[in-house]
């Protein structure tokens, strides 16, 4: 598994499926620490400290990671549980999928090997810009290449709030830029390649209060696209992004090894899972491409209530679909 990127902190056509799930739990831990690392005078002149873990001169505080036991077994479609959140006895979570019914599912495996087995528990979440049920079908003109009907307007130039497409600048050195745009400065360049036209937008949106004794989260993801390799380098630039809306960071936290947003044009295909790779035989991706599991890591303030939006969408048109697998959300410390 690769670790990629670091950030801070319905049924029937045309209907949306609201899979909102809320679980209330005891989030107490054995100790409490203040992990704030930002000093300086806040005037934006660059004298603010970098977050713990990014500044070698800053000692990170003690850490207590809440215990976790997977709760994704069975047949239900609890989106939070599928990625490792909201389990009994754990942290309060409010989560909901906004997607067409055919555009998301729970999955126990993909392909002919164990490459895409769960990285936590027994199942993981799939979001797709096409029918997720097509994933196990052989490729043809229609499998993994269908319009779903959009949650957003087809060809919409704006992604739903709080996502912002424009670059914010350096939010580390100038914290007053938080909230003005994408602190990762990775979304705008990719969307400009599709003239900001998005189709088949699907998302999982999570609101959660960060435990007082942690200051980061991570999760695993894999990206697959029928547009690989034929559309690589073109304007048909499907994307997967994860927007973090926190007190000290507003922006994308799902990045490639090179620090780019995850898109058809930045991923291309990985050598082990290029078209005709054995792991993809018998799937709609057998002539296309995929990534292995990757890990995204993001920093955020302890005790802050944050919103995290996992989103995937087609670029420029709604055919040649893309999918993202998401699993193993966990808390941690820098």
Regions found by a protein language model. Give the residues of each.
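Ser/Thr-rich, Pro/Gly/Ala-heavy low-complexity intrinsically disordered linkers and tails
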Residues: 1-58
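Aromatic (Trp/Tyr/Phe) and Gly/Pro-enriched flexible surface segments
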Residues: 50-334
């Amino acid at each position: 598994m690769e670790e990629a990127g670091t950030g801070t902190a319905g049924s029937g056509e045309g209907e949306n499926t609201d899979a909102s799930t809320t679980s209330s739990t005891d989030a107490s831990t054995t100790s409490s620490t203040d992990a704030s690392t930002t000093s300086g005078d806040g005037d934006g002149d660059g004298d603010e400290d970098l977050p713990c873990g990014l500044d070698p001169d800053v000692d990170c505080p003690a850490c207590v990671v809440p215990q976790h036991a997977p709760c994704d077994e069975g047949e239900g479609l609890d989106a939070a549980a599928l990625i490792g959140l909201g389990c009994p006895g754990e942290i309060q979570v409010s989560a909901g999928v906004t997607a067409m019914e055919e555009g998301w599912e729970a999955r126990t495996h993909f392909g002919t090997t164990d490459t895409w087995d769960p990285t936590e528990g027994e199942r993981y979440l799939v979001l797709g810009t096409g029918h997720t049920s097509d994933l196990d079908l052989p490729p043809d003109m229609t499998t993994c290449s269908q319009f779903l009907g959009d949650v957003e307007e087809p060809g919409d130039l704006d992604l739903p709030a709080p996502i912002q497409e424009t670059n914010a600048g350096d939010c580390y050195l100038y914290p007053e830029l938080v909230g003005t745009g994408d602190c990762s400065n990775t979304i705008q360049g990719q969307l400009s390649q599709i003239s900001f036209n998005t189709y088949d937008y699907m998302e999982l949106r999570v609101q959660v209060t960060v435990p007082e004794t942690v200051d980061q989260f991570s999760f695993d993801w894999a990206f697959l696209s029928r547009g690989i390799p034929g559309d690589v380098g073109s304007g048909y630039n499907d994307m997967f992004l994860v927007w973090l809306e926190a007190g000290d960071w507003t922006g994308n936290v799902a990045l490639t090894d090179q620090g780019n947003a995850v898109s058809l044009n930045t991923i291309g295909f990985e050598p082990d899972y290029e078209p005709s790779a054995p792991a993809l035989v018998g799937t709609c991706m057998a002539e296309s491409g995929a990534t292995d599991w990757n890990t995204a890591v993001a920093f955020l303030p302890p005790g802050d209530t944050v919103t995290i939006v996992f989103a995937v969408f087609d670029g420029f048109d709604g055919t040649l679909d893309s999918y993202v697998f998401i699993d193993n959300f966990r808390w941690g410390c820098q």
